């Protein structure tokens, strides 16, 4: 089966902002933390006379510096004090995620060390001076944002002069130990500038970045395989929110690609379906962990919250993948042929083959995977439930029959027992 050939591209500028938005959803009381750290780091870099390219890299690092954080419990550690006790886990995780993502691997080393004390970082011999400076700047910028958010604002929502002095005092007290001294000096100068504080708002920060978009990420737009690398990063961030949904996106992606091959789709369409599987649940980053982990039946309000993840997915994907078929294939995974699905209530004539394939694949994988309220189902039970949904006119019969005909390998892919599908 063929679809119009398209060169799938992902906008790396928007990817970095979507990572920041995704991390806001993990549990920060103060949203736009990534935006503010990016802005603080960039502003300080420019004051120090860094090159525009290096300052732009600092901005990008600020947006994604906490990409290794997935649960509220990890955030709680970072937000308990000026000097948090445990930071290595999310730094290492962020490093691993970025190192494996070719379009973003330039950011891996600075993220690995972005909570490392300057005394220790300055002695490391296998890290470039630029990466050391970037790590040190992100560390300092992150702690500036912690300090300004941890103290009360004035009655109009502005940082008080007293708090500016307090922040500068804390930074100076730790210069040469926690923080790189010359960066502390420049940061303290910056803290006295009213415009610096007044411009620290999400809309101003995004407008600022649009002025240097062409050096923000290199290349700005990437092709299908690079898009898949980015999608794999997002899938790991999404799946890590819950041990019960861990690897769900990855397994859906692999199974969708395998079934597409069996159904005669072109190699490019198969890869696009793999991409769609990876990103279909990206909207779940905004779903509270308490709902994802709930072992009991959901209330109406909680179910409504679950349902909105499909819409949140669509909006995020529209920002990153402009006018791509992949957006619909991923975002339609809870639509049903009889119109009973969500969030749009689409019917059969509005759902193309790939959208139907992802929907069936998502249900099959979810049934075979353990969830808070039940253990993973057997292959026989899973097929029985799927067949009932097909008979009721909700799911596509052709995709179901393909799964049924290749049931053993589909079950192994779905449960993670076989990551490499047999040749189509």
Predicted regions and their residues:
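Histidine- and acidic-residue-rich, metal-dependent catalytic cores
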Residues: 2-424
């Amino acid at each position: 089966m063929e679809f119009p050939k398209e060169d799938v591209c992902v906008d790396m500028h928007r990817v970095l902002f979507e990572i920041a938005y995704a991390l806001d959803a993990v549990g920060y009381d103060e949203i736009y933390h990534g935006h503010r750290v990016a802005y603080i780091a960039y502003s300080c870099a420019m004051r120090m006379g860094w090159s525009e390219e290096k300052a732009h890299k600092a901005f990008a690092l600020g947006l994604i510096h906490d990409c290794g954080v997935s649960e509220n419990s990890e955030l709680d550690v970072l937000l308990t004090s000026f000097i948090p006790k445990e930071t290595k886990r999310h730094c290492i995780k962020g490093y691993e995620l970025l190192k494996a993502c070719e379009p973003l691997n330039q950011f891996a080393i600075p993220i690995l060390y972005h909570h490392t004390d300057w005394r220790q970082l300055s002695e490391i011999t296998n890290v470039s001076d630029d990466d050391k400076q970037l790590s040190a700047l992100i560390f300092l910028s992150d702690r500036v944002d912690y300090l300004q958010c941890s103290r009360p604002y004035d009655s109009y929502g502005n940082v008080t002069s007293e708090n500016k002095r307090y922040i500068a005092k804390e930074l100076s007290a730790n210069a040469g130990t926690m923080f790189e001294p010359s960066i502390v000096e420049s940061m303290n100068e910056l803290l006295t500038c009213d415009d610096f504080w007044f411009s620290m708002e999400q809309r101003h920060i995004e407008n600022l970045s649009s002025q240097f978009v062409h050096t923000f990420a290199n290349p700005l737009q990437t092709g299908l395989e690079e898009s898949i690398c980015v999608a794999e990063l997002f899938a790991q961030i999404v799946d890590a929110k819950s041990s019960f949904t861990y690897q769900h996106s990855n397994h859906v992606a692999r199974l969708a690609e395998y079934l597409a091959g069996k159904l005669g789709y072109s190699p490019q369409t198969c890869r696009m379906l793999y991409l769609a599987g990876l990103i279909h649940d990206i909207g779940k980053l905004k779903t509270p962990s308490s709902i994802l982990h709930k072992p009991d039946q959901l209330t109406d309000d909680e179910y409504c919250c679950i349902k909105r993840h499909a819409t949140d997915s669509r909006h995020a994907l529209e920002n990153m993948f402009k006018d791509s078929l992949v957006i619909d294939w991923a975002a339609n995974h809870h639509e049903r042929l009889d119109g009973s699905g969500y969030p749009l209530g689409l019917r059969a004539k509005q759902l193309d083959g790939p959208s139907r394939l992802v929907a069936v694949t998502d249900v099959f994988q979810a049934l075979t995977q353990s969830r808070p309220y039940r253990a993973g189902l057997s292959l026989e039970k899973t097929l029985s439930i799927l067949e009932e949904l097909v008979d009721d006119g909700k799911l596509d019969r052709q995709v179901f029959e393909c799964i049924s005909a290749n049931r053993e390998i589909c079950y192994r892919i779905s449960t993670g027992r076989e990551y490499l599908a047999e040749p189509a």
